[in-house]
Amino acid sequence: MKENNKTIEAKNKELRDATKEFNEKLQKFLKDKVKKGFQIKNPNYKIDDNKISSNEVFKNNKNDFELNLPKNTWEEKTNKPESFENYKNVIPPYEDKFLPENFKEKFAPKNIKSEPLINKKDNLKEKNNNPVFDEVKIQEDDKFFDFSKFSETVSNQPENILKIEENDFKEIHDDFVSQYETFSKLETKENTNDLKTNLSSDTIKTIESKNEPEVQIESEIKDDSLEKEISEDDSFMDIFKAEQPDNQEDDSFVIDEEKAKEEYQEIKTNKSIVSDSHKIDIYEENEDLMKLNTLKSDKGIIYQIFGPVVDVKFARNQMPNINDCLEVKLPNNKKLVLEVALLEGDDVARCISMGSTEGLYRGLEVINTKNPIMAPVGSAVLGRMFNVVGEPIDNKPMPEKVEYSPIHKKPPSFDEQSTKTEIFETGIKVIDLLVPYVKGGKIGLFGGAGVGKTVLVQELIHNIATGHGGLSIFAGVGERTREGNDLYHEMIDGGVINQTALVFGQMNEPPGARMRVALTALTMAEHFRENNKQDVLLFIDNIFRFSQAGSEVSALLGRIPSAVGYQPTLAFEMGQLQERITSTKSGSITSVQAVYVPADDLTDPAPSTTFAHLDAKTVLDRKIASLGIYPAINPLESSSRMLDPSIVGIEHYKVARSVQTILQKFEELQDIIAILGIDELSEEDKLTVSRARKIRNFLSQPFFVAEKFSHKSGKYVSTQDTISGFSEIIEGKCDDIPEQYFLYVGGIDDVHKNYVAANSNNKVNSSNKPLNSENKSN
């Protein structure tokens, strides 16, 4: 009897071990099926809070293997089936406890009842949207299943939902039976019958409850069978066919090759769960994805925020394009504009913010405008001040009936560009003579604070408006807000504001705004050139800040820096801007760009890249400004490639070179004059110094925009009058006129008039002096 009890105890242990192994395989099998997208339609298996388990794994009779159902499932429905085949199509009720919050209300099919339907396929033929779980991820800390991806439209017919059928279960079942048979062969038939007799159903339930293993929730589940399924040797069609139930009776199951490819890539990508080193809050991610599923195709949600860089997640196949404009409605009813810079994986677009990201949070709705940033254009923008996205910043309402144009455009093609090289007359003597500007050219303006740069810019704006009927656009790129405010009010006082539009992206704004504000201003200028057929003057202050902002954006996007820390795409970005500044058959855009040279290093990549595009260089000198001569342009350091006899003419070229030669000789004599005095010079050098002083003074000019400061009327001098005036000085026709008569005049005629008037006054005064003395004596 004792031996018999030991035998039974040993057999019980063997049976428990076999049961335990069977349960492990069963649970692993079920988890893999759910992970691949199967819905468990067989109610024999239920999903608990932390594991998948089965009810009454086996019965006493090994040949009558089946899984028992919970009694309440079959109450008042049917008798307990005798075989697996009779209840394989039963649809169990939804398990609310493992679904995310509000999931059932939003996504559950409305025609599925809460109780099971038995063998009634005809009642489920109605079509409806039924999200099917594409993938199940397991979080180690939370111990629950989470559903991170849902298909958008899947038919509700049971034929289209893959189920765990008898043949899917057959492999595990056969393995268990073979182990049970091996166990049975250890004893005689009588002992086996005794074992069956002694093992009651209650005992089996007790064994199951004690030995059923807990599901190990790991951060990464490795399945050899799954690895085998997605190996490179297997084709995606074979894998997709393997997902079809072996005993599928309905012939409506059709293999879609494109869908098979997508599922193969998805299985291959998501075959392992996120590792511990890169945990994600899967539940929060699931909420974002659920929200995405309810949004329209042109909307996404904020996924990640770090500084001015914002990641936006979109629904699958709804990704925006590079440079697309995205809009975010902030809680304060304001609008934030993002520009798409990169397209990351997992349907994420990395964007650069055009404003402050304060107030943003994950899950906030984002609208894809499906267009680049749009800038206001047309006559409505004149006299107004805007930011990078075209919003007015002058405390005035948005202009009515304003047009919009994208800031990203291709430069004019070769056949659209003008082939003529035409000099752009500014009416400023020193520029037109020594540094002639070309229509559609780029001019670099070098000068520090307080040397008259703003006044020169205003005078150019005035002269192009009055002399050519042209317009001006001013782009403040990364400079001080104070300077922009001063410029705005000075333009109002100077009377040129109505011929100008101003666009500002100052240094306190994010790098995205500073990088794109020049394109916004250029877009406005292009509209006037093409639609109004006008000559436009585009001012960019400062072009160095444009390169600097691009460097910041490049670092934020994670690009590898190039020389001196600048972005590797510096030349490309500069070319995108500069190539659009040109002359076409309709009109021209002439750009004057202030250039800051860091540490006076002309080899710095930012200024050196700019120099390659410049046609002229205008240098403002503080020494000349200290002499009270304005505009304080240094005639020796400034240069232009337009100063060529084939372009400006032989006479213009000779006069300009003679002026530069005299000024250069005068510069060389400065040291001798400072040491020995001017009296020690030769007669020829004295004549050179005299003419140089007159030329230096004659390069000055009264400006229209400075009339209220200088109390002198502004002068616009044509190029021909400028050439003739300097020619007379060089030829010695004005040697008898003192140098003070050349200061702040227009043409050479004004010099003669002032001199004659002064002489006549002197004669009158000299003739009156003796008469007065005689009267006194008398």
Swiss-Prot record:
Reactions the enzyme catalyzes: ATP + H2O + 4 H(+)(in) = ADP + phosphate + 5 H(+)(out)
Span list, region ATP synthase subunit beta: 290-778
Main location: membrane
Region annotation Unknown: where it falls in the sequence: 1-289
Binding site for ATP: G447, G448, A449, G450, V451, G452, K453, T454
SMART domains (alphabetical): AAA
Signal sequence annotation: none
CDD domains: ATP-synt_F1_beta_C (cd18110), ATP-synt_F1_beta_N (cd18115), F1-ATPase_beta_CD (cd01133)
Domain of life: Bacteria
Membrane topology designation: Peripheral membrane protein
Alphabetically ordered keywords of this record: ATP synthesis, ATP-binding, Cell membrane, CF(1), Hydrogen ion transport, Ion transport, Membrane, Nucleotide-binding, Translocase, Transport
InterPro entries assigned to the protein according to its UniProt record, in alphabetical order: AAA+_ATPase (IPR003593), ATP-synt_VA_C (IPR055190), ATP_synth_F1_bsu (IPR005722), ATPase_a/bsu_AS (IPR020003), ATPase_alpha/beta_chains (IPR050053), ATPase_F1/V1/A1_a/bsu_N (IPR004100), ATPase_F1/V1/A1_a/bsu_N_sf (IPR036121), ATPase_F1/V1/A1_a/bsu_nucl-bd (IPR000194)
UniProt-recorded Gene Ontology molecular function terms: ATP binding; ATP hydrolysis activity; proton-transporting ATP synthase activity, rotational mechanism
Cellular compartments per GO CC: plasma membrane; proton-transporting ATP synthase complex
Keyword DNA-binding in record: no
The UniProt record lists the keyword Transport: yes
Record localization: Cell membrane
Enzyme class: translocase
Quaternary structure annotation from Swiss-Prot or TrEMBL: F-type ATPases have 2 components, CF(1) - the catalytic core - and CF(0) - the membrane proton channel. CF(1) has five subunits: alpha(3), beta(3), gamma(1), delta(1), epsilon(1). CF(0) has three main subunits: a(1), b(2) and c(9-12). The alpha and beta chains form an alternating ring which encloses part of the gamma chain. CF(1) is attached to CF(0) by a central stalk formed by the gamma and epsilon chains, while a peripheral stalk is formed by the delta and b chains.
NCBIfam families: atpD
Family according to the record: Belongs to the ATPase alpha/beta chains family.
PANTHER family xref list: ATP SYNTHASE, ATP SYNTHASE SUBUNIT BETA, MITOCHONDRIAL
Protein name (Swiss-Prot/TrEMBL): ATP synthase subunit beta
